[in-house]
């Protein structure tokens, strides 16, 4: 079973973590015991585009780090022979800033937010404290399995 990550870099930023992201997607499939291959669309964007998307779909006029949109095709996964879980928009400018703020490596921050975005596609959220703990525990377990550490 091969999971498919469709990457669209809509910036001039030289993105270096596709292999790491593919490993994360593979680990997610194992974690959720998926029987069909996963397919995910990933867009690397900047502050301007993510702010526009956030305003249009969430009515929030601000930049954010990651936005996740579940797939309309999820109900058709058996007919398609794969599970298209959705689309993620990852703001590289915010990722770089947050890596510095949290004293994380750039790889860690990119991987953490990518994983966080996927977990949202599975219906998890962090509005309530108990939900946030559960969501973060899943993300951290994926980071540990792939030996992606917090520090530089």
UniProtKB/Swiss-Prot annotation:
Cellular component terms (Gene Ontology): cytoplasm
GO terms for MF: metalloendopeptidase activity; RNA endonuclease activity; zinc ion binding
Annotated Gene3D superfamilies: Metalloproteases ('zincins'), catalytic domain (3.40.390.30)
Gene Ontology biological-process entries: rRNA processing
Location in or out of the cell: Cytoplasm
NCBIfam families, sorted: rRNA maturation RNase YbeY (TIGR00043)
Protein family membership: Belongs to the endoribonuclease YbeY family.
Protein name according to UniProt: Endoribonuclease YbeY
Primary gene name: ybeY
């Amino acid at each position: 079973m091969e999971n498919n990550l469709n990457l669209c870099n809509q910036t001039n930023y030289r993105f270096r973590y596709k292999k790491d992201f593919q490993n994360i997607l593979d680990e997610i499939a194992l974690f959720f015991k998926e029987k069909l291959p996963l397919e995910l669309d990933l867009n690397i964007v900047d502050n301007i585009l993510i702010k526009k998307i956030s305003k249009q779909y969430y009515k929030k006029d601000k930049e954010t780090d990651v936005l996740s949109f579940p797939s309309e095709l999820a109900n058709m996964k058996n007919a398609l022979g794969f599970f298209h879980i959705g689309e993620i928009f990852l703001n590289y400018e915010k990722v770089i800033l947050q890596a510095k703020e949290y004293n994380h490596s750039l790889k860690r921050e990119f991987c953490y937010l990518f994983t966080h975005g996927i977990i949202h596609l599975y219906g998890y959220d962090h509005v309530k404290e108990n939900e946030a703990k559960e969501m973060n525990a899943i993300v951290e377990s994926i980071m540990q399995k792939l030996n992606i550490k917090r520090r530089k």
